[in-house]
């Protein structure tokens, strides 16, 4: 194992849930204002995951007061304190950039239904 690979392995987080584009997440972000620190929740749909290892990022999109807001988070950053999965989305693409042009119900992502075991 190379030196950089071992450094990357030390920096990886183990508490990251498995999520994919189309899923709706609550991302708890650590915000520092002066000498105070608080947690802010950003809830929206994952429109992309990119990269791998320590450098992996994901982008979450939400519509706030009629304006589309996207934030890109480093997956293994200490700024992200917690990631919660709200719903699983059923999409056929890895990058959901087409949601930027859609409005209203057209921008809604179908929810993935788990098969019922009988």
Swiss-Prot record:
Source organism, top-level taxon: Bacteria
Disulfide bonds: none
Keyword Secreted attached: no
One Pfam family recorded for the sequence: Ribosomal_L19
Keyword Lipoprotein attributed: no
Gene Ontology cellular component terms for the protein in this record: cytosolic large ribosomal subunit
Keywords of the record: Ribonucleoprotein, Ribosomal protein
Gene Ontology BP annotations: translation
GO MF annotations in UniProt: structural constituent of ribosome
PROSITE patterns to which the protein is assigned, alphabetical: RIBOSOMAL_L19 (PS01015)
InterPro entries listed in its UniProt record: Ribosomal_bL19, Ribosomal_bL19_CS, Ribosomal_bL19_sf, Translation_prot_SH3-like_sf
Family affiliation: Belongs to the bacterial ribosomal protein bL19 family.
Function description: This protein is located at the 30S-50S ribosomal subunit interface and may play a role in the structure and function of the aminoacyl-tRNA binding site.
Name by which UniProt lists this protein: Large ribosomal subunit protein bL19
Originating species: Frankia alni (strain DSM 45986 / CECT 9034 / ACN14a)
């Amino acid at each position: 194992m190379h030196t950089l690979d071992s450094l990357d392995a030390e920096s990886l987080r183990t508490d990251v849930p498995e999520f994919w584009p189309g899923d709706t997440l609550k991302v708890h972000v650590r915000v520092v204002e002066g000498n105070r620190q608080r947690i802010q929740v950003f809830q929206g749909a994952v429109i992309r995951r990119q990269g791998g290892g320590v450098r992996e990022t994901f982008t979450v999109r939400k519509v706030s007061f009629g304006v589309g807001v996207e934030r890109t988070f480093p997956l293994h950053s200490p700024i992200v304190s917690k990631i919660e999965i709200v719903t699983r989305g059923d999409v056929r693409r890895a990058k959901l950039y087409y949601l930027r042009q859609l409005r209203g119900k057209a921008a809604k992502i179908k929810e993935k239904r788990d098969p019922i075991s009988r």
